[in-house]
């Protein structure tokens, strides 16, 4: 039987018809913003490509360390246009890979050092928000990963045991039984959950615009509507109003994440995977009371097809997930931001996990690409001979990691005496993705296999051995 409020064709069949096709986060910041474009020529100390969190945090920390330097950020659209302004609003200390998975690549000590630095990043971001007066609805309520079927409980507890075995503390990751989980939020089905305190909720668009305003006050140039055509040693070639231009720079930092395939240097460094979201109307006090989302911890489940949600500051459920197809040749188009089938599946998850909100109207739906490296591992690349650096590889967990890697690349370039220079991501180069059509076949197979395995496990309570082996080989 489907949850109350759902229909045979899904909760979203009616609700999606009138949903605004833009991020709900954009409703909260309507202050005037003047666009400045790049000059046809010029010279700066640091040129940063990408006006998202990676680029803006890099500009921020360079401006603190070298206030006399000229710094410019190139953005093809407007700041916060990409994933930074339309993500799920999680600022999580977790990487896409767990501590035990990072240990397999870098060793135990390096993995634990990376995680300690990432957990501490939330304190750093919070301190900047307070110091700079950036209002973005910052709220630290932690995060839970809930087991919605018994098989997920076994898997989550087994994975948690691996983390504790290498030295991750109970204070950082611990198990909640079903009653403790329901004390966090009144989920329809839970067999317990992994909890971490290292996660905050934010309005990411407010956060990115707030940071941009601070940068302007600090004298950083933000050049929007100025797409970069090519990166050369010490030169950024761009177009503004259809006219070519070139700006020289002592250092060029590429911070383009999901849009990296459009550059020659990073054609196969990442694939742009689309993550889509919906948001409900503000929920009534009665529904909120039934949900008992007490600390506003973020939510995900233990399935392979990622789903993620938060209760926003104004009482909405903002929920998203993967499942939209990868497009041949790593193509990115505005029309890909909307996918009815995927949005419908995400909207139905509200009724499945949060039945009291099953009748809530869907007011917004949106999506966008995020960058995924072949090994799901972040990296900081510094090439002094080419006056070039690059950061990225967040695999959807970038709101905190962008800050960490921005501080790292600044410390590395300036050769600061900093523990961040011991992070294993410095100099790490992920393998390139396969050429087409192998990439198209492989990535979309991963998406379909993940969905198929989740469906089989929910129906039978058992994991399909052949499909599970296939997906592990593809990864």
Q: Where in the sequence are the language-model features?
A:
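Extreme N-terminal leader/targeting segments of oxidoreductases
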Residues: 1-46, 64-65, 69-70
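Glycine-rich Rossmann-fold phosphate-binding loop(s) that bind the pyrophosphate
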Residues: 50-54, 76
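Glycine-rich FAD pyrophosphate-binding loop
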Residues: 63-86
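Dinucleotide-binding Rossmann-like beta1-alpha1 core, especially the glycine-rich loop
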Residues: 94-178
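Short beta-strand to alpha-helix junction loop
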Residues: 113-119, 146-155, 194-214, 223, ...
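Helical element adjacent to the flavin cofactor pocket in flavoenzyme catalytic cores
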Residues: 161-166, 188-250
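Flavin-dependent oxidoreductases
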Residues: 231-312
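C-terminal catalytic lobe of FAD-dependent flavoproteins
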Residues: 319, 325-449
